[in-house]
């Protein structure tokens, strides 16, 4: 049943004017048909993210006309049927990309994507949604590519740019997993010597953990700070609940805010964030292996290979003739003694063990199973450290280029919606060099990605020219767009 039953008293929905510029459709057939072209042309152009071609528009108008010309049917009912067809079209569901005309059709080349495709790439990268009217107007005039810097600045100032922070950071640093991660709070606290602090790992605390990491990245992006502050900095973001979790006093209220950290604080930088410490742990204890692998993979871009299938779990190596519960460091030493394990674990373990003062909930602790924690170690590259403070300093000072390369590869992958291959190596090198010249500023990374050949050009080489009617005769690249 669909009401109201009496069409004379049909009430327009609140968003009626967004689709129909007139209060009532024209009564004459020719004028109604032209009005249908106007309504559907505007909607299809927006949905397809480029001008709709005449052939497609005629089909949509005919589809609508077949409904609203029937007795007892309203004009809006016919338009609604055509709108459904637009939303079911591959041109809406997928990103359809055309190329700019090729200067020498006989020579294989990687042509630039046209300006409409560039507008979509830019918008989905920064906003995770379709281009707005300004981007579309610039693309229509062929002026977007030469105004990229100003448009990126405008888009970064828009509230929709928060999507880049949440989606990219959520995937890159795995903080999207925080709210669903399972952990046995009692068991974790018991390993720390029976902490009397009551911990309620509820949705509010988990959300604060995630927001701490997002807000650090967001501040670096907004104020064009150095990306190295992700590794170590003298501030963080907390509310009362997260501050209490960290043992930080003097913070009240539910709102997250920036606070300065003491000089000797182990906090500061993503390696001390509860969000990351939580998702790189096991449900009942810390995991130096997961934490070390996280640093190698996500921060340094040098992941260790997966372990052989026949290697036993760490818990199976437990046992002590004195009845004492071994520490995680001792268990790791036993595990590392196996020839098949030593090569990879010698890379991962020192970094992971440097974070052992943080339990599986991201809380600071001095002891594990009644024994003082030893967080010292030596990296495979030769640098020695005493604790997590030293490790963060070493990563920031000695491995900045590795970090620049890693974050460049991650962001370029996010921007393109695909994995990188050998064709992209030169572009990554150029962005890393730019970051080095500009002291790791966020703008160097963002503009470097947007101005890079992989972002600006088609992946497949072609010798074909592109028709002026891109949706009818062009050679098209249809790419499934999944929000990053």
Regions found by a protein language model. Give the residues of each.
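A conserved hydrophobic secondary-structure block that centers on an alpha-helix together
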Residues: 21-82, 90
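Extended, well-ordered alpha-helical scaffold/bundle regions in very large, multi-domain proteins
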Residues: 55, 72-76, 95, 105-119, ...
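Short coil/turn segments at secondary-structure boundaries
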Residues: 11-15, 52-58, 76-80, 94-100, ...
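Short, basic, low-complexity termini and linkers enriched in Ser/Thr/Gly/Pro
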Residues: 471-480
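A cross-family structural signal marking well-folded subdomains
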Residues: 140, 146-294, 304-305, 482
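Extended acidic/polar, glycine-enriched regions
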Residues: 1-25
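Sequence context surrounding c-type heme c attachment/ligation sites in exported
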Residues: 67, 243, 258-402, 415, ...
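Short alpha-helical scaffolding segments that buttress acidic/His motifs in well-ordered protein cores
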Residues: 39-47, 60-64, 79-87, 119-123, ...
């Amino acid at each position: 049943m669909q009401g109201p039953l009496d069409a004379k008293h049909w009430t327009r929905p609140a968003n009626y004017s967004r689709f129909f510029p007139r209060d009532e459709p024209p009564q004459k057939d020719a004028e109604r048909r032209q009005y249908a072209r106007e309504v559907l042309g505007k909607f299809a152009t927006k949905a397809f993210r480029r001008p709709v071609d005449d052939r497609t528009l005629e089909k949509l108008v005919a589809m609508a006309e077949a409904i609203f010309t029937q007795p007892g049917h309203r004009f809006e009912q016919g338009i609604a049927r055509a709108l459904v067809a637009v939303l079911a079209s591959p041109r809406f569901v997928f990103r359809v990309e055309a190329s700019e005309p090729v200067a020498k059709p006989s020579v294989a080349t990687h042509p630039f994507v046209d300006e409409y495709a560039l507008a979509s790439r830019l918008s989905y990268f920064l906003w995770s949604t379709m281009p707005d009217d300004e981007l579309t107007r610039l693309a229509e005039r062929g002026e977007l590519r030469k105004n990229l810097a100003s448009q990126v600045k405008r888009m970064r100032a828009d509230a929709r740019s928060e999507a880049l922070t949440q989606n990219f950071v959520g995937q890159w640093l795995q903080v999207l997993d925080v709210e669903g991660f399972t952990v046995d709070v009692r068991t974790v606290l018991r390993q720390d010597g029976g902490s009397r602090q009551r911990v309620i790992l509820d949705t509010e605390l988990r959300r604060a953990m995630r927001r701490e990491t997002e807000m650090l990245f967001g501040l670096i992006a907004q104020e064009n700070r150095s990306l190295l502050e992700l590794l170590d900095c003298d501030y963080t973001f907390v509310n009362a609940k997260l501050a209490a979790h960290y043992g930080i006093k003097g913070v009240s209220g539910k709102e997250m805010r920036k606070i300065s950290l003491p000089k000797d604080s182990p906090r500061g930088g993503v390696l001390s964030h509860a969000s990351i410490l939580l998702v790189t742990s096991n449900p009942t204890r810390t995991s130096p292996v997961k934490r070390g692998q996280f640093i190698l993979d996500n921060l340094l871009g040098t992941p260790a290979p997966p372990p052989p299938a026949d290697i036993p779990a760490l818990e199976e190596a437990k046992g002590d003739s004195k009845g004492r519960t071994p520490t995680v460091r001792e268990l790791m030493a036993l595990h590392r003694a196996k020839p098949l394990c030593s090569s990879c674990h010698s890379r991962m373990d020192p970094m992971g063990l440097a974070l052992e003062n943080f339990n599986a909930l991201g809380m600071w602790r001095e002891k594990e199973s009644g024994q003082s924690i030893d967080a010292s170690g030596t990296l495979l590259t030769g640098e020695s450290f005493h604790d997590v403070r030293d490790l963060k300093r070493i990563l920031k000072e000695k491995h900045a280029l590795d970090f620049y390369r890693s974050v460049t590869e991650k962001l370029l992958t996010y921007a393109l919606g695909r994995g990188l291959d050998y064709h992209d190596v030169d572009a990554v090198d150029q962005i890393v060099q730019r970051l080095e010249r500009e002291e790791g500023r966020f703008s160097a990374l963002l503009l470097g990605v947007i101005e890079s050949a992989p972002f600006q050009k088609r992946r497949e080489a072609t010798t074909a020219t592109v028709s002026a009617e891109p949706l009818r005769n062009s050679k098209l690249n249809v790419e499934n767009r999944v929000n990053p």
